[in-house]
């Protein structure tokens, strides 16, 4: 038998600690439930990682202000112990090991990005400590029959589901589509699912191209797609990649009738970074602050947005709302279990049903929820809901005008 060297993140390693912050609570240690997390607070995806740190903190503070979490009639305060993984997946795994074995946190909140959640959930499974995470959507995370990982992002394979439905009804008609995606767990899952969605809907996939994660130069790729005369381009990537794709599309005068992106478009940062060039871009989100979503602690989605922006001076997006619901899920599950025992809380998570500011939470047998994606578009510098679960909400600005005609 030939031995195979396992990836670094599958091995339990001594933990190197970076960027530790611990929320201080003036209660006795035995009256505190500590949630541990490793999040990207520096490095290439820190701009998104901050949503999770901030969402965790504001939600913990909100729950504590309301009296905390009760177990057997006794109130407990929540605390957060969080590390900066510097956008390094191997460091993240070491930090989750540290959180469980040395810091002795009670439960785990997740990182951002599917490749991190895929790796870090190995630790929660090994030590049988429940992790609720709203940063990883790859189908691969939930294909391993793990019992201790729960996720509040919908399956990546269906991210473009609502977008494909929209494409069917556009005039002028969409026929040829380009599918472009990064070479990472999330984006590959998106592409695999979207490929089937497009074929089932009768579209021709004129280009099907993968690029290296964290790519900055898309000129060759864009030129190749441009030569195919596609009507629509669907891009699965992370925010910096998406920004570069738009900027370089403009410089190469690449103007299909439509392009849509998995991330970036719903955020205030996207619109600020691109200015007028953000207009006409389509994207998706599982959450909007205008949605009629009520919860136990903030009241509703709009109040969450108001409090979040007042505290952190930027608008929350679905990453923040998902992160907040992760904390809420633990509060609900702990009270339902009436215990701090990890197995009992895990079992409570598996059967829990409650309304969060992010939407209804109920995990399937794989540990995932399936909220439908909302299609959004930037119109005149503002984010506009185009298609919701019940169909079209507002008319899209389509087709996208040529760059030199704007």
Swiss-Prot record:
Keyword Transport listed: yes
Signal sequence residues: 1-29
Keywords, in A-Z order: Amino-acid transport, Signal, Transport
Gene3D superfamilies: 3.40.50.2300
SUPFAM superfamilies (alphabetical): Periplasmic binding protein-like I
Entry keyword Transport: yes
A single GO BP: amino acid transport
Entry-linked Pfam families: Peripla_BP_6
Domain of life: Bacteria
Function: Component of an amino-acid transport system.
Family of the protein in this entry: Belongs to the leucine-binding protein family.
Protein name: Leu/Ile/Val-binding protein homolog 5
Taxonomic source organism: Brucella abortus (strain 2308)
């Amino acid at each position: 038998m030939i031995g195979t060297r396992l990836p670094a993140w599958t091995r339990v390693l001594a933990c190197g600690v970076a960027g530790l912050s611990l929320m201080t609570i003036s209660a006795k240690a035995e009256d505190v439930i500590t949630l541990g997390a490793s999040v990207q607070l520096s490095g290439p995806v820190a701009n998104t990682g901050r949503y999770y740190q901030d969402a965790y903190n504001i939600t913990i503070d909100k729950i504590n202000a309301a009296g905390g979490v009760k177990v057997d009639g006794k109130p407990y305060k929540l605390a957060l112990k969080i590390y900066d993984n510097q956008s390094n997946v191997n460091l993240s795994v070491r930090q989750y090991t540290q959180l469980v074995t040395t810091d002795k946190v009670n439960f785990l909140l997740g990182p951002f990005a599917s490749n991190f959640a895929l790796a870090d959930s190995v630790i929660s499974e090994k030590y049988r400590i429940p992790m609720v995470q709203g940063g990883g959507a790859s189908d691969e995370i939930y294909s391993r029959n793990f019992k201790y990982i729960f996720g509040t992002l919908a399956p990546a394979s269906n991210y473009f589901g609502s977008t494909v439905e929209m494409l069917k009804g556009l005039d002028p008609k969409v026929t040829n589509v380009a599918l472009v995606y990064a070479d990472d767990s999330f984006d590959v899952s998106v592409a695999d699912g979207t490929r089937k969605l497009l074929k089932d809907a009768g579209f021709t996939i004129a280009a099907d191209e993968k690029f290296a994660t964290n790519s900055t130069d898309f000129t060759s790729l864009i030129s190749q797609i441009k030569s195919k005369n596609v009507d629509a381009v669907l891009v699965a990537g992370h925010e910096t990649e998406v920004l570069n794709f738009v900027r370089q599309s403009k410089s190469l005068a690449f103007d299909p009738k439509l392009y849509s992106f998995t991330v970036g478009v719903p955020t205030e940062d996207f619109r600020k970074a691109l200015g007028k060039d953000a207009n006409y871009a389509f994207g998706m989100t599982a959450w909007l602050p205008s949605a009629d979503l009520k919860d136990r602690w903030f009241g509703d989605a709009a109040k969450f947005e108001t409090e979040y922006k007042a505290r952190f001076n930027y608008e929350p997006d679905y990453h923040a709302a998902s992160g907040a619901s992760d904390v809420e899920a633990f509060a609900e599950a702990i009270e339902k279990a009436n215990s701090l025992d990890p197995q009992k809380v895990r079992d409570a998570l598996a059967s829990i049903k409650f309304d969060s500011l992010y939407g209804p939470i109920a995990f399937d047998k794989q540990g995932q929820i399936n909220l439908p994606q909302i299609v959004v578009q930037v119109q005149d510098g503002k984010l506009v809901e185009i298609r919701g679960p019940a169909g079209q909400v507002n008319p899209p600005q389509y087709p996208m005008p040529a760059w030199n005609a704007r």
